Amino acid sequence: MQTLIWNTLNSAQKQAALSRPAQAVGEQITQAVNAIKSNVINNGDKALFELAEKFDKTTLESLVISKAQVEQASQRIATELKQAIQTAKGNIERFHQAQKNQTVDLETQAGVRCQVVTRPIQNVGLYIPGGSAPLFSTVLMLAVPAKIAGCKTIVLCSPPPIADEILYTANLCGVETIYAIGGAQAIFAMANGTESVQKVDKIFGPGNAFVTEAKRQVLQQGTAIDMPAGPSEVLVIADEFADPDFVASDLLSQAEHGSDSQVILVTNCETLAKQTALSIEQQLARLPRAETARKALAHSRTFIAEDLQQCVEISNAYAPEHLVVQVENARNLLPFLDNAGSIFLGAYSPESMGDYASGTNHVLPTYGYTRTHSSLGLADFSKRMTVQELTPQGFKDLANTVMLMAEAEQLEAHKQAVAIRLEKLTQE
């Protein structure tokens, strides 16, 4: 990790130092995704079977996972892991249940009633990546709020062969339909529907560059997605009271995600920075994914700040996905932290807790999007509608205001919609 003293940098250098690794969708990826889209839209299930053989090296008998397959998968999972998943599910349920919208129903003036009503998104699709490490925790993060929100149909896609942990967790969360479909083809299948796959209104879940590009394309064509996606990242604010081993472990927990991940340490203590660098090397030696972590560390940085106030300013400028605060009285900094997907306060709140079981959602905006986007929550699985209802007297009292405004905007039909009613009321 490169170490930089913040106050020695000019504005351009600061901006460059806070930059992320470049994210560019290559022409090859775009062309490949376009070909997959055309194939799925034109050939439906047939394309999905062919693509499973091509990309997943799997010959499928059915795209739909049977209840018997789910039951067999559940039996193969250790009891201890089942209990851990159930504990995490309970915490996630409690946190998201508490996010239910409060009723908004009031008179803005006498006889003018305004409301906000919330309705679930009817049909949602969840995408869970495959690979060597099954992300069954993401099933919890997506399926639990979808159920609490009351989504009518929840389907899940994951590349075959689907890990037992994913099948067990999906079933535990009440997902009734699971498809053995991965990659960009899963996104296009859920967005457009096929003979077997139900069309959905919104798609959730992470994925590789092909999945990300497919989600971008379906968003342009009318299917909603959860949020823009990018490489994983963490920023740690630490002072002289922080444990360098703890700080190093938090940085490495993100660095091991992928070579394009980025980790940032911001501290007002040079000694802590040096101790953390030593601890990183010691811990790297014990990590199975050390090579991946080293690649991420190559474009990661340590910033030496003047004081904690400057640490906060740097963090807000970077706008991290994960923000770990390991300082004395960490909660005292919270009112000044404006841009982060999820914040972890104190020495015993590692980012891993939020990734799995504290109850917060680990689906977070990255790449600086936390300036304008929020962590995934119950609201993402529902939509708000406003309602207004006016009594005759309420209408009369507000009529002149509306007619004056409509006339000023030269929208005569708007004005007449009020004037016609007002005339009939005065005749009664």
Swiss-Prot record:
Binds 1 zinc ion per subunit. The active site is at E321 (proton acceptor), H322 (proton acceptor). Pathway: Amino-acid biosynthesis; L-histidine biosynthesis; L-histidine from 5-phospho-alpha-D-ribose 1-diphosphate: step 9/9. GO terms for cellular component: cytosol. Substrate binds at S232, Q254, H257, H322, D355, E409, H414. Its cofactor is Zn(2+). Keywords: Amino-acid biosynthesis, Histidine biosynthesis, Metal-binding, NAD, Oxidoreductase, Zinc. It catalyses: L-histidinol + 2 NAD(+) + H2O = L-histidine + 2 NADH + 3 H(+). GO terms for molecular function: histidinol dehydrogenase activity; NAD binding; zinc ion binding. It is an enzyme of class 1 (oxidoreductase). Transmembrane segments: none annotated. InterPro entries: Ald_DH/histidinol_DH (IPR016161), Histidinol_DH_CS (IPR001692), Histidinol_DH_monofunct (IPR022695), Hstdl_DH (IPR012131). GO terms for biological process: L-histidine biosynthetic process. It holds the Pfam family Histidinol_dh. Zn(2+) binds at Q254, H257, D355, H414. It comes from the Bacteria. Its EC number is 1.1.1.23. CDD domains: Histidinol_dh (cd06572). NAD(+) binds at Y127, Q185, N208. Belongs to the histidinol dehydrogenase family. PANTHER family: HISTIDINE BIOSYNTHESIS TRIFUNCTIONAL PROTEIN, HISTIDINOL DEHYDROGENASE HDH. Catalyzes the sequential NAD-dependent oxidations of L-histidinol to L-histidinaldehyde and then to L-histidine. This is Histidinol dehydrogenase. It comes from Pasteurella multocida (strain Pm70).
